[in-house]
Curated annotation (Swiss-Prot):
Its cofactor is Mg(2+). It comes from Shewanella sp. (strain W3-18-1). The gene is eno. This is Enolase. Its EC number is 4.2.1.11. (2R)-2-phosphoglycerate binds at Q167, K341, R370, S371, K392.
Length: 431
């Protein structure tokens, strides 16, 4: 038994300069796991609650000392003496201790940090990498793959201070044979895009996730400069590299309309889906995330009907990594993919359940970071250990993003051919 002998919580900083919760779980035998909770900017209304202190005299109210006290107090007391390898049991203890639907008593940030730290400690006690331990928890031991990265190289929306409405424009190096090659391709395109923007007299400052954030005349212009960069870098758009969007449409949904203030256009629900389809007809866009508001289920049905057979339609704010909401989506044929974010649901066990449910229904699962990150690279191990096939972890700069890519490089080196990189086959509608 990997007996828990101590649980420690502390307040640390995330990549946006805001506090977050870090936890350590100590086991008999000297094994220790440490993990930190990430934090989102564009958040779904049904996400598990990130507990903040609200004390304006500290960190402008964003402190997490209450959540940290919960880790060092009731959570620690409840977990002492328990077996760290019994992940589902540990997570259930914390969920029951909280007793709320959205973890607003103890805080999803407190519960998640401990949940992930326990998994890391358990892996250490077993003498195996975290991805291997996750595969065992997932009921898929030894089944691995390297994820296709969705690299967020141009930012708008809530992730940038510019006039571009769509939140993320991403490249996917689907033509690569290995993850290492995919990363190189993405980096070359990123640096080429910087030159393209600079030569046009556009800003090369970066947003929260490391993508460039220039002011552009339209969302189509963003796709055009990316196309130019891909081709200048020596790659073929549509073959070597495909495109993906995260609209984060809930952020510009007002009074039943989709208001693209940056380019002065307003759409009704079906009109915005038609607009996205027109972009996908012009460019090789193979994945669109949150293409409509989280509450616009009729609109999602239409979007799935007109694009779902050829394009991966990813629910982020729509599903918030929640199996209850995902069940409704599956039953109604809404979207065909789910974005997976640990902190939307608040524990490793519930995260794995969402991935399993998606896969069993023929939906893809895209593992994702948040805009507020730390050096914690657990999502890299999650992507490989569940053979999810896709990962979103930002651009090719900022160490909080690159930490995940570097961990994937290490894992690929360890696993070799046991973790294939399958490219386009991983993306819904493209196999």
């Amino acid at each position: 038994m990997a007996k828990i002998i101590n649980v420690i919580g502390r307040e640390i900083m995330d990549s946006r300069g805001n506090p977050t919760v870090e936890a350590e779980v100590h086991l008999e035998g000297g094994f220790v796991g440490m993990a930190a909770a990430p934090s989102g900017a564009s958040t779904g209304s049904r996400e598990a609650l990130e507990l903040r202190d609200g004390d304006k005299s500290r960190y402008l109210g964003k402190g997490v000392l209450t959540a940290v006290a919960n880790v060092n107090g009731v959570i620690r007391t409840a977990l002492l003496g328990k077996d760290a390898t019994a992940q589902a049991e540990l997570d259930q203890i914390m969920i029951d201790l909280d007793g709320t639907e959205n973890k607003d008593k103890l805080g999803a940030n407190a519960i998640l940090a401990v949940s992930l730290a326990a998994a890391k400690a358990a892996a250490a006690s077993k003498g195996i990498p975290l991805y291997a331990h996750i595969a065992e928890l997932n009921g898929t031991p030894g089944q691995y793959s390297m994820p296709v990265p969705m690299m967020n190289i141009l930012n708008g929306g809530e992730h940038a201070d510019n006039n571009v409405d769509i939140q993320e424009f991403m490249v996917q190096p689907v033509g690569a044979k290995t993850f290492r090659e995919a990363l190189r391709m993405g980096a070359e395109i990123f640096h080429t895009l910087k030159k393209v923007l600079h030569d046009k007299g556009l800003s090369t400052s970066v947003g929260d996730e490391g993508g460039f954030a220039p002011n552009l005349a339209s969302n189509a212009d963003a796709l055009a400069v990316i196309k130019e960069a891909v081709e200048l870098a020596g790659y073929k758009l549509g073959t070597d590299v495909t495109l993906a969007l995260d609209c984060a449409a809930s952020e510009f949904y007002k009074d039943g309309k989709y208001d693209l203030a940056g380019e002065g256009k307003v759409f009704d629900s079906n009109g915005f889906s038609d607009f996205l389809k027109s972009l996908a007809d012009q460019y090789p866009i193979v994945s669109i995330e949150d293409g409509l508001d989280e509450s616009d289920w009729d609109g999602w049905a239409y979007q799935t009907q007109i694009m779902g057979d050829k394009i991966q339609l990813v629910g982020d704010d729509l599903f918030v990594t929640n199996t209850k909401i995902l069940t409704r989506g599956i039953e109604n044929g809404i979207a065909n993919s789910i974005l997976i974010k640990f902190n939307q649901i608040g524990s490793l066990t519930e995260t794995l359940a969402a991935i399993r449910m998606a896969k069993e229904a023929g939906y893809t699962a895209v593992i994702s970071h948040r805009s507020g990150e730390t050096e914690d690279a657990t999502i890299a191990d999650l992507a490989v250990g569940t053979a999810a096939g896709q990962i979103k972890t930002g651009s090719l700069c900022r160490s909080d993003r690159v930490a995940k890519y570097n961990q994937l490089l290490r894992i690929e080196e360890q696993l070799g051919e046991k973790a294939p990189y399958r490219g386009l086959k991983e993306i819904k509608g493209q196999a």
